[in-house]
Amino acid sequence: MKTVDVIVGRINEGEYVYSVVMDAPEVPFGLNGTGRTVDEAKADFLDAYKEIRDIMDEECKQYEDLSFNYKYDIPSFLNYYAHILSLAGLEKISGINQRQLSHYINGTSKPRKSTVERFSKKLKSFAEDLCSIDVI
């Protein structure tokens, strides 16, 4: 099984708000999905994957099974995890103030590459801290 990157991002076209696109030029087909929520877009993406596998089976073409590593842009991440992580909490984790995070969510401001890297690094550090905790 091969693991490929999949980009989850916000789009502002028509009724769909989120897009999920496979970022794997080495794979002989492309995949994408769209939806009003990240979950809908992921489900649409996985449906497309099932459909392409069915087509390849019908045409007797071989393919490698894929697993997916989802990568989020900051607005999509903030929206997807908003029910778990508050902006106040994310400010403490990332050092980016709530107002700026809110601008990212609303699309009124776009983070610089250095901000994205810092946000990702701080978030992963927080996740590592959580993984090292044992509750007794």
Name the predicted role of every residue range.
Residues 1-5, 47-116, 129-135:
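Short, charged, surface-exposed hinge/linker loops at domain edges
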Residues 1-58:
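DNA-contacting interfaces and partner/effector-binding or oligomerization modules
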Residues 118-123:
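Short, basic, alpha-helical segments at the C-terminal edge of helix-turn-helix-like DNA-binding modules
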